[in-house]
């Protein structure tokens, strides 16, 4: 063989080699002559080594070529047979590759799998020095002959494929090229990478070896091709390059190759420069049968690979933390690509010897031309993996024989093609070099691999971003169920279903990227793991992000390989930090989040993608906010923009939902919502940044496409078999599903914790009562069930529902085809839903027969007809919010949670006065935004059956949906009682069409004679005045028309239900009346039970008797001025329908047989919106109906709202009847023995005017004798009975209450003159008798009212305007009836008069005498008086009415100026006497302690401490005793002295309003007195805190009074300590300021400013200066942190680990990644505990989630004491255990308080929420005590709110809001954990808590053990006393209820012996 030296000065520095050099190139180790030249199937290369070989290879020398090392680390291969250097000898220059080369090994003789070790191929950037990676093939004689036939087929196929591309001249060289391909298969470097699955027969290899040996003759010259072949060869080369690309792109088995060849770059050449390749489509579609065997994708970084391409699922390639180049990647991939099923021959492509290609321009051109075809053909074969070689060993002889002639032709190439051929082959060479990588990456391709062409673009920023390929939708959904479709989205890529799509593998550049980018890449790639692949536990093994490494985390290991069956059943992802997920995507749909247009940082992608894409399971719970508190690169998840209304890309029908699960991955609210039969096990994130409505809304939208017109999403936790049937074509199935879904009407905006939802009925139409019972008892696991004792009673009223006929359902669908009732509520519903609800049937043992226990509202404990009588019910009546009235006020529904049964002793009431002022206080400006305008009507529903959902954001609601309910009589078993849940929505709900209203009558037209319908109910339809539409958008629109099956067959008898559905149309925000027959309105009227079985008088607003109240004809109603619903008891066989004001859309409507119902005029009602119960006012309903108190229960009438307060009822009408026109707003009604029907005006008139209507008033006048003993003696607001241990409280809010709005039923109307409001009718049978006692009520109240009427000559319309101005003010009024109707024995009254006369000197100016005289005269006439019905018609902010004509006319001007102490607060119910201290001053609420004392002084009397008994004769009787009146009377401080006194204690005593009853003679003496004008200042501005501009360290507290009388004194106090006192203040503006110098934590507390002048003292409310306010005023005033600490200490490097939680935070806890930081710690600790010391420290470096450099922190070092001979290792372990335990305890308590806060948010007026700060585990490697905890430093007064026994131990903080909320939190946790876990040691600064402890039961709680003794739980249970926050949360008292016996109807009540209920804890307060 000859070789000539080429000219090295050629531009390309290339070598042209003859064909003999193919076998002798240094790039491929020559084959030993004494060994066979064929390769074993199972062994490829065992002797790889880098160049140059240190040993001389004799075989290499035999070839005539010698490798010569050069100084530039290159090798020049010289031919040893050269005659001269300048001749045509061969010199090959190549780069020396020192990297480890590919090692190809065979696993065993029996396997066909090729196994490749990882090796690196160093890529050379020099275009002239391409690295030839040597592969030494050890010849063997084994199994190559087994695929002889396959090889022949492959060769034939190759011939057919590429023969057409060549000219006739080139065809002559075909056999030569084939032979060379066979040689190249064995010789070239990368044969290992492409030889997978290819087997060569020994015969073929022998033939090839012979051919190679024959070509090594040194004397054989090159053959030179003629010029005729130049053009043909060039075209052939181009065409062959195109074939190369095309074959790679159209591979049948590797469809992903089509994108790889687009950007192929080989040195300076890219494929795009040669061909403009578009995305080529694969011509095959993978069948589904291939999927289970081939889907096994494992994407690793920075290079990608597929593991186990054909079912191989246990060979996970672990990623190294070093970037590798493409060659290494290629070889790494190959080792896992061996497959036992790879029986098709994959042509082995090897990197050809570079010497074959590098031919200079001066060499033979024919060689280049023909060699190009060979090379490109080989390239084609390397890329065309799927093609089969058609010709194998049968052509070997022809190949061998034609080699020499072929080489001769190549040596004669013409120079005309030199340039073109040279350039082309350079490019081809480069393509081949890159083609190796492409070919190997092509092996990664799956036939079902999703498109992942550019996932790495976010990490390898230096790599050009490729455009997203267009993705086609799958042909049909069933494919999705069987095909795995993970969809991993990055900022510039999308994965799609791979069925019939052109998928491409992303190209990974070998660019060294940062750790953050690498982490991000891992995150984005690992989520594509397929079902058959093991969990990728080690993807982020050694990554580092933002100074945080993952290497410190131990490598988690999967427990076992999951089979397909396991994945389908368990779907358990293994989520390591920062990389993560096993995505079982079976059944996934292609609805995925696309974040392409969201420019986010890498860390955002890490947190959003990593933690949310793992949720795309078909059965795995939602994990929408796993990364809630993680921070990376100064980015926290909470900073991510909230997505308001995420939308899915398309809507799904219910059929689709059944077959294909649809995960919708949102950035912060992702959910897998398969609504039919899905596994409802959701992960609830405590700090969910968005509301659940944003999660649910997309599903609602998707469900719109369903063929079901009404929402059929069944979210109740029932048997999935009952609801999963999605065959919508079957009518019966659809009907049943509709029944279930509508019965389950559940707010789809609350969190999908379906375990708390309650099913309403069962699909089992043939179910029995037992089935219903089991349904209720088993399907509501989180709701306490009724006691065993009363289950039988409950079963009597439960029966299986009546099925809906197909006709009925069809009618429904036809009529409301566009109506899709979405039951979406508000955020508060979400939060309120998780509250704890206890049923009223729970009672304490031994108290069954002790008599009824009444709640704080003075009612029987059961307000609805219970299955057991309320006398035995020992819990409050607010069970699950079921009995909330139909129009339950939206804003105060939280306040109707189960009141705590707190029957405090006198000691506790003493503490209530002193301790609860701030806690209970509520002002109208703090109250709810909208006023209630509806009447409260009770529902005759079983407490344990009906559950009513209320919406809190009703001011914004404009849709209401109401369920219909049937009520059976309690004693009749088998009657169906359906449970209705009402939801409101302000979004997209639709209502029934107007035309549907006409079907109400037919729908409800039942047999009037049906006797089984004993619990008949009217249908109440409400409307809202136009003046309140803005606040009452949430009016109930209609009851749910779809539940036609609720008309039980038993109920209807033989009636035929027409199936026509009730419908109503909204006009504005008001529900119009329902037309059709007489059934025009919805209403609920029930009759009180006729007889009481137990001893206590029942005041339940629900009927217990099966007889309903009678119907009052419409004509009768139209002639009555009493607008309230009053029923004639004698007409018990008919129905009453009333239209009453409806609060904002809450409650349930009940409809029934109302065929004869009459129309009741609309009644609008303003309900006081807040009441804080302290003690019962009476034993029964607060509305003291006379008939309730009589033994004849048949006369009982119950039509009052179930609100337990006096109701304001506004008549909604402009049309007044004659009686209404004649009536005044002071009409009173006495109640003898007859009911009064009431109606005035036309109910159809939806408008309401203030001046145009005159509401009527009614009141009760008859009090039962036995009940009168429990009423207040006087008008005092709070009295305590020492003997009975009962505190009597009258509630108000210092707000004006137009009492005309209230009416009491069963009263006979008595109209009176306008100016005589106190007169009542003489016709009352009991009124005359009662009036004798009532003539001696609190004279000051009479006086005030009379004077008010006298000085009110304005017309009635004006008076009405005054009252109307207050109707938006929520006021709770209970005192009126209680005060005025108390029976006072004459002797006692005389005694009081005597005390008054003797103890009170006669005043000089007896101003009120004349007024009192009139009051007395009017009382003598025997009129029952209601002194305060017209009281408080004016607001404190408004000028008072004109003074009486008998008062000094000069006082009118001051009347217009004087205002109340608190302008923002409406006046209390009792007005001050205008004849007292200035008759026009109706303002100053006087302090409770001294109100009577000041009242006497205002009447120019003197009342000292010594004469207190004479001033309070009525209070010091043996039965009732005022508490804490004698304290500090000399100061005469008004009510504002107390810290935020509760509303119930702020009822003001009006001027001259005496607390005692005065004798008639005294009144006469005072008649002619003229009042003395006294200027009373008022508080213009309450205390406010402002910074001092001059000195940011100072703050100023200021307030303002007006007017400022002369000789006034200003006194500033802090918690009773006088800070400043200024005498004789003279200021025009009335503003007074207190400056606090250098304000610090010591200045925190309650501040108050008082203005004292003469006998008047006016004070502001106590202002609480908290640490939050202090920090806001002082610290932010500086540019730098206030007083930066100059800390001297040691700086050390630490690693912090946060404690993370999974779904169950009690059992699934783990520490996150270590985050490096540096801290500077003081040397001396500032605090010390049992096992730890606290050091102040400052973070100097590092970004922790809650800290930044410079942030003050506290380092707590747990130093365990060394006992005995413990070694250092044991101490370190103990130190670690203590630190870890504290992290677990406090962070677990933090999770509990998060849940507590979510519940507390739903309680209006709850206020600020407490927080437990997180702590972190700190590792200090350089310290002897290596482990500690780190937490935020709390600045301020550190207070222990409660300790382990649950008591509040800090007396200075006895009324602390934080302290009470902490105790309520302890109570809440105790209840939630059923007494098994208690959070103790509640302490901290303000609302931020730390150092908490947890006590658990002995065995722990759910695997969690606390750090406190179990005895703490028992102590808490015994000592905890509920506060107002416990009540707001509906928590039941832990104390045993006191056994009090309510007096039966006896002449005298026997006092109950004293019993200290709560132990000695309050002894100090007594």
Swiss-Prot record:
Gene Ontology, cellular component aspect: basolateral plasma membrane
Sequence ranges of Basic residues compositional bias: 1388-1397
Composition-biased stretches (Polar residues): 211-227
Domain Alpha-type protein kinase: from-to ranges: 1702-1934
GO terms of biological process kind: cardiac muscle cell development; epicardium morphogenesis; heart contraction; heart morphogenesis
EC numbers for this chain: 2.7.11.1
UniProt keyword Disulfide bond present: yes
A GO molecular-function descriptor: ATP binding
Presence of the UniProt keyword Transport in the record: no
Tissue expression per record: Expressed in developing cardiac tissue.
Disulphide bridges: 1599-1649
Stretches with biased composition (Basic and acidic residues): 1325-1342, 1401-1417
Principal subcellular localisation of the protein: membrane
Pfam families for this protein: Alpha_kinase (PF02816)
Comp. bias (Low complexity): 1211-1221
Free-text disruption phenotype from the record: Morpholino knockdown in the embryo causes reduced heart beating rates and cardiomyocyte numbers at 48 hours post-fertilization (hpf). At 72 hpf, embryos display pericardial and yolk sac effusion and pronounced cardiac malformation coupled with defects in posterior development. Embryos also lack ventricular epicardium at 96 hpf.
Keywords, comma-separated and alphabetical: Cell membrane, Disulfide bond, Immunoglobulin domain, Kinase, Membrane, Serine/threonine-protein kinase, Transferase
Region (Disordered): 23-65, 211-231, 1211-1259, 1303-1365, 1386-1423, 1437-1463, 1937-1966
Similarity comment text for this entry: Belongs to the protein kinase superfamily. Alpha-type protein kinase family. ALPK subfamily.
Protein's name in the database: Alpha-protein kinase 2
Organism: Danio rerio (Zebrafish)
Taxonomy of the source species: Eukaryota, Metazoa, Chordata, Craniata, Vertebrata
Gene name linked to the record: alpk2
């Amino acid at each position: 063989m000859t070789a000539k030296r080429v000219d090295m000065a050629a531009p390309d520095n290339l070598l042209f080699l003859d064909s003999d050099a193919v076998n002798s190139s240094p790039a491929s180790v020559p084959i030993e002559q004494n060994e066979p030249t064929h390769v074993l199937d199972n062994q490829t290369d065992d002797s790889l080594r880098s160049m140059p070989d240190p040993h001389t290879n004799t075989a290499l020398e035999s070839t005539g070529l010698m490798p010569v090392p050069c100084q530039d680390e290159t090798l020049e291969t010289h031919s040893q047979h050269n005659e001269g250097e300048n001749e045509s000898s061969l010199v090959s220059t190549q780069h020396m590759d020192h990297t480890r080369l590919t090692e190809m090994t065979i696993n065993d003789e029996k396997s066909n799998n090729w196994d490749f070790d990882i090796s690196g191929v160093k890529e050379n950037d020099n275009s002239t020095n391409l690295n030839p990676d040597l592969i030494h093939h050890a010849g063997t004689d084994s199994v190559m002959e087994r695929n002889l036939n396959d090889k022949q087929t492959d060769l034939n196929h190759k011939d057919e494929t590429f023969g057409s591309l060549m000219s006739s001249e080139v065809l002559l060289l075909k056999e030569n090229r084939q032979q060379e391909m066979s040689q190249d298969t064995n010789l070239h470097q990368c044969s290992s990478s492409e030889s997978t699955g290819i087997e060569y027969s020994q015969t073929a290899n022998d033939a090839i070896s012979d051919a190679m040996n024959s070509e090594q003759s040194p004397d054989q010259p090159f053959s030179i091709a003629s010029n005729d072949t130049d053009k043909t060869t060039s075209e052939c080369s181009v065409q062959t390059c195109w074939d190369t690309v095309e074959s790679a792109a159209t591979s049948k088995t590797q469809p992903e190759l089509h994108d790889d060849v687009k950007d192929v770059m080989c040195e300076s050449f890219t494929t795009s420069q040669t061909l403009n390749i578009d995305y080529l489509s694969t011509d095959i579609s993978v069948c589904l049968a291939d999927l289970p065997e081939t889907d096994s994708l494992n994407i690793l970084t920075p290079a990608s690979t597929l593991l186990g391409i054909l079912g191989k699922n246990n060979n996970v390639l672990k990623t190294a933390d070093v970037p590798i180049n493409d060659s290494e990647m290629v070889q790494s991939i190959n080792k896992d690509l061996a497959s036992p099923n790879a029986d098709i021959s994959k042509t082995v492509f090897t990197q050809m010897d570079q010497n074959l290609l590098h031919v200079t321009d001066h060499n033979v051109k024919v060689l280049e031309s023909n060699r190009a075809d060979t090379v490109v053909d080989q390239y084609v074969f390397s890329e065309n993996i799927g093609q089969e070689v058609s010709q194998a060993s049968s052509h070997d002889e022809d190949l061998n024989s034609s080699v020499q002639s072929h080489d001769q032709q190549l040596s004669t190439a013409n120079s005309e093609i030199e340039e073109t051929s040279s350039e082309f082959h350079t490019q081809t060479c480069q393509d081949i070099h890159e083609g190796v990588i492409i070919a190997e990456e092509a092996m990664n391709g799956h036939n079902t691999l999703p498109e992942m062409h550019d996932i790495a673009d976010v990490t390898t920023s230096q790599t050009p971003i490729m455009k997203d390929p267009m993705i086609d939708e799958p042909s049909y959904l069933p494919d999705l169920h069987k095909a795995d479709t993970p969809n991993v989205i990055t900022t510039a890529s999308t994965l799609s279903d791979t069925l019939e799509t052109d998928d491409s593998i992303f190209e990974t550049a070998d660019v060294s990227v940062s750790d953050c980018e690498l982490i991000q890449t891992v995150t984005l790639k690992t989520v594509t793991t397929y079902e058959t692949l093991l969990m990728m536990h080690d993807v982020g093994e050694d990554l580092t992000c933002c100074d945080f490494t993952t290497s410190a985390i131990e490598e988690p290991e999967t427990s076992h390989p999951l089979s397909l069956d396991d994945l389908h059943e368990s779907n358990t992802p293994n989520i390591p930090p920062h990389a993560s997920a096993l995505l079982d995507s079976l059944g996934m749909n292609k609805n995925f989040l696309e974040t392409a247009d969201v420019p986010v940082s890498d860390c955002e992608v890490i947190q959003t993608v990593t933690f949310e894409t793992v949720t795309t399971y078909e059965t795995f719970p939602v994990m929408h906010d796993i990364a809630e508190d993680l921070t990376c690169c100064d980015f926290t998840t909470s900073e991510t923009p909230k997505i308001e209304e995420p939308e899915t890309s398309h809507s799904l029908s219910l059929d689709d939902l059944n077959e294909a699960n649809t995960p919708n991955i949102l950035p912060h609210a992702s959910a897998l919502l398969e609504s039919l039969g899905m596994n409802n096990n959701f992960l609830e994130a405590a700090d969910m940044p968005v509301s659940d409505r944003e999660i649910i809304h997309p599903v609602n939208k998707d469900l719109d496409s369903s063929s079901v017109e009404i929402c059929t999403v069944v979210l109740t936790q029932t048997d999935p078999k009952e609801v999963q049937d999605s065959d919508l074509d079957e009518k019966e199935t659809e009907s049943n599903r509709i029944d279930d879904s509508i019965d389950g009407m559940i707010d789809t905006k609350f969190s999908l914790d379906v375990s708390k939802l309650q099913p309403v009925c069962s699909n089992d139409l043939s179910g029995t009562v037992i089935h219903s019972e089991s349904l209720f008892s088993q399907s509501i696991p989180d709701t306490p069930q009724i006691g065993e004792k009363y289950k039988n009673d409950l079963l009597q009223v439960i029966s299986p529902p009546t099925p809906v006929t197909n006709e009925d359902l069809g009618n429904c669908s036809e009529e409301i085809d566009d109506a899709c009732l979405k039951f979406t509520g508000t955020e508060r519903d979400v939060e309120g839903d998780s509250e704890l609800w206890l049923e009223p049937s729970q009672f304490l043992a031994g108290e069954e027969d002790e008599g009824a226990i009444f709640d704080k509202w003075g009612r029987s404990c059961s307000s609805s007809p219970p299955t057991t009588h309320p006398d035995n019910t020992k819990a409050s009546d607010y069970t699950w919010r079921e009995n909330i009235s139909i129009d339950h006020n939206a804003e105060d529904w939280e306040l109707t949670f189960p009141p705590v049964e707190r029957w405090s002793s006198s000691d506790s009431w003493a503490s209530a006065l002193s301790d609860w002022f701030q806690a209970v206080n509520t002002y109208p400006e703090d109250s709810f935004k909208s006023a209630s305008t509806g009447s409260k009507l009770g529902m005759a529903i079983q407490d344990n059956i009906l559950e009513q959902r209320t919406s809190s954001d009703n001011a914004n609601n404009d849709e209401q949906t109401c369920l219909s309910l049937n009520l059976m009589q309690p004693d009749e078993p088998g009657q169906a009682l359906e449970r209705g849940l009402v939801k409101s929505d302000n979004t997209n709900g639709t209502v029934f069409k107007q035309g549907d209203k006409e079907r109400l009558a037919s729908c409800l037209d039942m047999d009037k004679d049906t006797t089984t319908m004993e619990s008949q109910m009217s249908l109440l339809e409400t409307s809202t005045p136009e003046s309140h539409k803005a606040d009452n958008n949430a009016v109930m629109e209609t009851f749910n028309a779809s539940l036609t099956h609720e008309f039980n067959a038993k109920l209807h008898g033989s009636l035929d239900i027409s199936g026509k559905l009730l419908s109503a149309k909204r006009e504005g925000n008001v529900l119009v009346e329902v037309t059709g027959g007489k059934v025009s309105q919805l209403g609920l009227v029930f009759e009180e039970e006729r007889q009481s079985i137990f001893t206590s008088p029942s005041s339940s607003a629900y009927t217990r008797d099966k007889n309903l109240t009678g119907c009052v004809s419409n004509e009768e109603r139209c002639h009555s001025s009493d607008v309230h619903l009053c029923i004639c008891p004698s007409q018990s066989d008919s129905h009453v329908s009333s239209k009453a004001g409806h609060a904002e859309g809450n409650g349930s409507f009940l409809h029934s047989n109302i065929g004869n119902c009459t129309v009741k005029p609309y009644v609008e009602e303003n309900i006081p919106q807040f009441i804080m119960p302290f003690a019962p006012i009476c034993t029964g309903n607060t509305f003291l109906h006379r008939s309730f108190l009589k033994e004849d229960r048949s006369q009982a009438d119950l039509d009052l709202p179930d609100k337990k307060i006096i109701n304001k009822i506004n008549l909604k009408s402009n049309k007044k009847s004659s009686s209404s026109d004649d009536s005044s707003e002071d009409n009173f009604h006495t109640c003898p023995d007859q009911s009064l029907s009431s109606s005035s005006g036309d109910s159809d008139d939806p408008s309401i005017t203030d001046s145009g209507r005159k509401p009527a008033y009614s009141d009760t006048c008859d009090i039962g004798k036995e009940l009168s003993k429990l009423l207040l003696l006087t008008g005092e607001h709070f009295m305590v009975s020492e003997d009975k241990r009962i505190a009597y409280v009258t509630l108000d809010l210092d707000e004006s209450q137009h009492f005309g709005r209230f009416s009491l039923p069963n009263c006979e109307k008595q109209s009176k003159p306008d100016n005589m409001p106190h007169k009542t009718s003489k016709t009352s049978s009991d009124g005359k008798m009662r009036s004798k006692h009532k003539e001696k009520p609190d004279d000051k109240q009479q006086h005030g009212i009379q004077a008010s009427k006298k000085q009110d000559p304005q017309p009635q319309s004006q008076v009405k305007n005054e009252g109307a101005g207050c109707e938006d003010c929520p006021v709770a009024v209970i005192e009126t009836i209680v005060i005025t109707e108390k029976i006072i024995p004459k002797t006692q009254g005389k005694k009081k008069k005597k005390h008054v006369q003797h103890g009170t000197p006669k005043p000089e100016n007896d101003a009120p005498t004349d007024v009192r005289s009139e009051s007395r005269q009017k009382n003598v006439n025997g009129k029952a008086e209601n002194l305060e019905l017209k009281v408080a018609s004016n607001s404190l902010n408004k000028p008072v009415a004109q003074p009486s004509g008998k008062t000094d006319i000069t006082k009118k001007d001051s009347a217009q100026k004087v205002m109340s102490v608190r302008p923002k607060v409406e006046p209390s119910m009792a007005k001050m006497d205008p004849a007292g201290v200035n008759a026009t001053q109706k303002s100053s609420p006087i302090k409770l302690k001294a109100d009577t004392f000041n009242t006497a002084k205002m009447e120019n009397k003197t009342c000292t401490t010594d004469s207190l008994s004479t001033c309070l004769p009525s209070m010091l009787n043996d039965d009732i005793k005022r508490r804490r009146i004698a304290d500090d009377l000399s100061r005469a401080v008004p009510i504002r002295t107390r810290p935020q006194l509760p509303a119930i204690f702020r009822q003001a005593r009006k001027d001259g309003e005496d607390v005692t009853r005065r004798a008639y003679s005294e009144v006469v003496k005072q008649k002619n007195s003229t009042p003395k004008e006294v200027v009373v200042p008022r508080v213009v501005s309450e205390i406010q805190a402002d910074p001092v501009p001059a000195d940011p360290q100072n703050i100023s507290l200021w307030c303002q009074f007006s007017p400022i009388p002369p000789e006034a004194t200003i006194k500033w106090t802090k918690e009773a300590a006088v800070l400043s006192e200024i005498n004789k203040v003279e200021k025009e503006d009335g503003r007074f300021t207190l400056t606090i110098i250098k304000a610090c934590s010591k200045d925190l507390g309650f501040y108050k400013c008082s203005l004292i002048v003469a006998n008047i003292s006016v004070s502001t409310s106590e202002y609480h200066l908290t640490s939050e306010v202090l920090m806001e005023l002082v610290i932010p005033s500086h540019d730098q942190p206030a007083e930066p600490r100059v800390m001297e200490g040691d700086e050390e490097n630490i690693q912090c680990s946060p404690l993370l939680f999974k779904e169950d935070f009690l059992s699934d806890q783990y520490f996150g990644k270590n985050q490096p930081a540096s801290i500077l710690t003081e040397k001396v600790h500032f605090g010390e505990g049992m096992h730890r010391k606290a050091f102040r420290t400052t973070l100097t470096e590092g970004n922790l989630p809650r800290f930044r450099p410079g942030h003050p922190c506290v380092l707590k070092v747990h130093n365990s004491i060394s006992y005995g001979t413990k070694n250092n290792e044991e101490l370190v372990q103990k130190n670690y255990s203590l630190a870890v335990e504290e992290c677990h305890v406090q962070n677990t308590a933090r999770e509990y308080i998060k849940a507590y806060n979510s519940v507390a948010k739903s309680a209006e007026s709850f206020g600020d929420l407490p927080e437990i700060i997180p702590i972190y585990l700190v590792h200090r490697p350089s310290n002897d005590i290596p482990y500690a905890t780190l937490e935020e430093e709390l600045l301020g007064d550190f207070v222990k709110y409660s300790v382990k026994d649950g008591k509040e131990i800090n007396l200075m903080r006895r009324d602390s809001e934080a302290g009470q909320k902490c105790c309520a939190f302890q109570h809440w946790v105790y209840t939630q954990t059923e007494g098994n876990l208690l959070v103790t040691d509640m302490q901290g600064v303000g609302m931020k808590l730390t150092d908490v402890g947890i006590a658990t039961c002995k065995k722990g709680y759910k695997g969690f053990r606390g750090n406190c003794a179990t005895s703490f739980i028992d102590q808490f249970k015994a000592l905890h006393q509920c506060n107002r926050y416990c009540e707001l949360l509906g928590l039941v008292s832990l104390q045993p209820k006191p056994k009090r016996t309510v007096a039966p109807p006896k002449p005298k009540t026997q006092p109950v012996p004293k019993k200290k209920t709560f132990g000695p804890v309050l002894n100090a307060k007594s």
